[in-house]
Amino acid sequence: MRVAYVDPFSGASGDMLLGALVDAGVPPEELADRLASALDVDGYRLVVERVVRRGLAGTQVRVIVEAAQPARDWAEIRDLLSASALPPRVKERALAVFRRLAEAEASVHSVPLESVHFHEVGAVDSIVDVVGVVWGFELLGVEEITCGPLPLSRGWVETAHGRLPVPAPATALLLAQAGAPLVPLDIEAELVTPTGAALLVELARFVRPAFLPERVGYGFGTRELPWPNALRLWIGEAFAVPSRLDEAELLLEANLDDMNPQFIEPLVDQLFAAGALDVYLTPIVMKRSRPAVIVSAICRAKDRPVLERVLFEHSTTFGVRGIPIERTKLARRSVAVATRWGEVAVKLKIVQDRIVDAVPEYRDCLAIHQRTGLPIREIWNEAARLAAVWIGQRVGEEDQEATLPE
């Protein structure tokens, strides 16, 4: 799956995201042509520049407005986008971004949603930024967008409502609603704009993904800062990483000195059914010379609650010990051999890509013994002889799931 990771180390705005997308591979001429043909707006042009700021190179995209633009309200922007020739997914996501922003503005200024005037973000430049960013991710084939922590700056910003604190109230509400992670940055400047916040909150999840990076783009803003005023965008392929909980294993133990031994077999069966990787019994002598048994179950850490419940419900114990363990596990394969009396599964033991042993499965041999009455030793020996042809063969990592030659 193709993913994008937004690293807003110096903030986020619509033009910074658009610049990062172009820097990461979106063809600017193609994007400009698509926007011009799909949107019923004019009086603007896209200017794309390669810039170097504070020693870092990237792309700056500016929407140059060449004619006066109205301060559109939410209803006007909704109608404009709904009537556009945008692809359905781009249209839907762009509308969702503006609706989210309109709801935030309505909330912080206590006005009805339909009467929200965007002022700063209602002009054509913000419409082009929002639609361009949504379409840019589509052009790169991105299926999932994630975002890192955003900088929390201070100061004031001049708006149509007057002088307001940074982050602007709508920006602050958007970030709070999304639970976006914030990192304090001691500078008087608006680093995260309402448009940038709405785009990230609507399109992205605030997590760090596991992915194989293919390209990196930098999109620059217009403000001069003591560091590169840029947003970094990673594009790559996602891959699954097992969590620590999935990998961790435990040894659960309980001492039983007052339980009918006949009840231990069903207890062991229940532990295996609940997900135990292995279960074994150890005879011990407890206080007052009582004979007892330790029931030990190896399990994945995530399965601990289920196995503990089995031990408490199906044994007489009042307590269970949990001990973290580490195991070194060899690669193994399971194949089948055809004996004269039926198939027997065989486990192949692999060390450094070489098969070093082939062990018939006892249960299969037992089933044939019970059906035929033959000595189980004879059945096991024939299966082992047939399986011996694999011993010594090499198995490459890429062939672990392939069928070995017979």
UniProtKB/Swiss-Prot annotation:
The keyword RNA-binding does not apply. Keywords: Nickel. Signal peptide: none annotated. GO terms for molecular function: lyase activity; nickel cation binding. Disulfide bonds: none annotated. Belongs to the LarC family. This is Putative nickel insertion protein.
